[in-house]
């Protein structure tokens, strides 16, 4: 492989870097599994080459969560990539368009970095193997993240970037909408955690967290429907995602108690967001690796 021209740009981006585990491992691996089923033979061969034959769902789908600073307490933490911690959330304005607004630490930086990593992959022939692998892992994860409801920051909310000072709703402290305290089957958690860890696994507990079973259940769109989903630019997808997820915040408030009924009422959205993420990820990779 040729030595770099684009890698320097990518390294510079690493220095620009909210915490999250969007969809959890199950969701990210489900998205990756769906995507892999819709790769062209050429793209699949190239991906297999760079990942040493590993499926996208095995390590690539969750790598960005394992290198983030919130993973330091776990044995599977991979040090040296903490700058990527702020690439997990995106920010949209009142018209569901990408916003330049960021938290004081840079949180909400998913979109510009996703776009850059996609551009990098389009030039994969000019990158080192290791640079291709890193860009590939980032794209796989960020496409999953951008489709998760709790990873969208809406600037219409004055508490857009506020983080909780306490998990106790009776105590003072500004909390962002995705961090408001709710109770699922009596268990206290923030709304962000619900979407990261509960929304999918409780939708189909009989799947026992099998991403293969989830992908088979979710991947049912026709060829024509998939083509329509993938039409347009990444910014067009942002509009679709934000518009679809925004109504969630009209139906829940701080301190609400929810259960299986809520899982079922939001289940169609959760399923559809995962499926769209998988189709769009496949579309991106096919465009990057099929380019002449």
Feature map (PLM): residue ranges:
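N-terminal, motif-rich segments that launch catalysis or mediate targeting to/interaction with membranes
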Residues: 21-142, 149-292
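Bacterial Sec-dependent N-terminal signal peptides
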Residues: 1-25
